[in-house]
Amino acid sequence: WASYLSQDDSIIRDIPILCGMVSRNAVLLPDSNINVAEWTPESVNVEDLKNKRRNLAGFVYNYDIKANIELVRKLYPSTKHFALITDNSYGGISLQALVKKEIGKIKGIDFIPLDGRKNDIYNIIEEIKQLPPQSIILLGTWRVDVNDGYYVGNATYTMMLANPKVPA
């Protein structure tokens, strides 16, 4: 999916693509070899690509970041710090880009990325322990860390237990 979206328009303009259960947000892959840990891609909306004469159809997820932030503020009104856990995968990178973009539009939020491109699970746990008061954790995706270690669902419980005072 990411490879298709990142192609030059002239190559794929007339090729119909049907997607199933993919995120509406995406990041376009870079042309060159870059250090992925330092890469700060911009989130793009697949609908915008469709409007550029891409032949796209299918089912997409829409992550409503603003609504999630509003819900957190309603449940935990004193929240000032929003930590986002994402892994070292395309899904993690694209979700982090989307959340950064959307949180940047909202005043009064300190965004703390807990990034699996730069950290393994043990570093993330230490960062969670050090979160300031009035923090919450947004759990994006956690499957692959900086060392290409693969994790199953129990890793998220380990992270949540690192700082039980922080809502996750």
Predicted regions and their residues:
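Short hydrophobic alpha-helices and adjacent helix-cap/hinge residues
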Residues: 1-168
